Amino acid sequence: MKLFRLLPAAALLAACSSPDSPPSLPLSPSQDVSESAFAGQVYTQTNGAAGNQVLLFNRATDGSLTPGGSFWTGGTGTGAGLGNQSSLALNSTGRFLLTINAGSNEISTFVVRRDGTLDLVGHWPSGGTMPLSVTISGNIVYVVNGGGSGNIAGFTMSSRGVLSPIAGSALPLSSSASGPAQISFSPNGRILVVTEKATNSLSVYRVAPNGSATGPTVVPSNGATPFGFAFHGPVLVVSEAFGGAADASAASSYEVHANGTLETITPSAPTTETAACWVAFSIDGKYAYTANTGSGTITGYSVHNGALALLDADGVTGVFGAGSSPIDLAVSPDGAYLYALGSGAHAIAVFAINADGSLTSVPGGAAALVAGTNGLLAR
C-alpha cells in the first residue's frame, strides 16, 4: 500500500517544499589541512531565521554519515520550507561552495578545505528578494529570487570567491507571480533553465561567454507544477508535482538544443506517487530519481537516449517512510550512494545505488536536523 498525504496546492507551492561570524579570507592551497580520511562529504543548510549555517557530514566508504561541523553563512534563512531545489552549489573544482540566505536576501561563498571544512569568504546581496536557488558554471554565478516579482541575477566570482554583480543581468521571470523553484546552468554553461510552479512553465535564458543573459523564452511544461530538475549532457529531466494531487505526479524529459529550445522526449511519465518535487541523475546518466514528498518514497526511471521508463511498476524504488517528506536528493561523486533529505523526518537517509538502478536502504544517515533544513550536496 502506498503511503501518502495529500498536500494542499498552496502548501506545495510554498514548501514541497545567531550572530554573524566575521567573514574570513580563503586559505591558499598550501594552508589547507591534509586530505580527509573520509570518502567525501555531504552538505545541507539549516535555513535558520536567527542565523543560517551550512552543516557538514563526513561520508564514509559505506555511505554512512557522521557530523563534521557547522559553519555560519553570515546571513539568515526563513526557518520554514522554501519550495526549491539547489539552494547550495559547488563549483566544478569543488574549491568553492555557495549557498542562498533566503531570509537576508544574500548569497554566501565558502572556500572548501581538503578535509571538507569550510571558510566563509563573504555574503552579498542576491539582486532581489528571497533567493531560492543558485547555480555556477566556470566563474559565472546565477541565482533565482522568488520574492516580489521574482527575477534572476548574475555575478562573476573571483579566484578568491568574491562575487561581483554582472551589469544588466537582473532579468524577469515569465510573470510577476511565477513561483520559481530552481535555476541551473546546462552542462556547457550556455543555457539557464528556471522551473516555475505557478505558471506551469520553464523559463530559458541564453548566456554569453561574459555571463550576460538574454530571455526568457517561456516553454510550457508537459505537466502541472514543474519543480526540480537535473541535467545529464543535453538531457533535462523535470519533476511535475501536479499540485500535490494523490498519486498524480510525473517526470518529463527534454533535449536541450544549443539555441535554447527544448524538445520533449518523454512527456509526463507517471511516478504513480504524490508530489514528485526533486530530481537527481545517477552519475552515469542511466537512471533518474524523484523524491516524492507526499508519499515518503523515491521513484526511479531508466534513461535511454533521454527516454524515461519506470524501474518499478508501482513507482516505488526507495522508501523513506510515512511522514518523512523527502525533499532534496544528492548522489555521491562515485555514483555509489543516493542521499535524501526528509523535511518531515528531519533526517538524511542513505540508499545504495545498485547496478540496475534499484536502491537499497543502508544505515548510517543523519538525524535530529532542525525544521526548515534545506538543500543537499554530496562531494
Give, region by region, the residue ranges found by the protein language model.
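Residue position within the beta-strands of beta-propeller blades
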Residues: 44, 99, 143, 194, ...
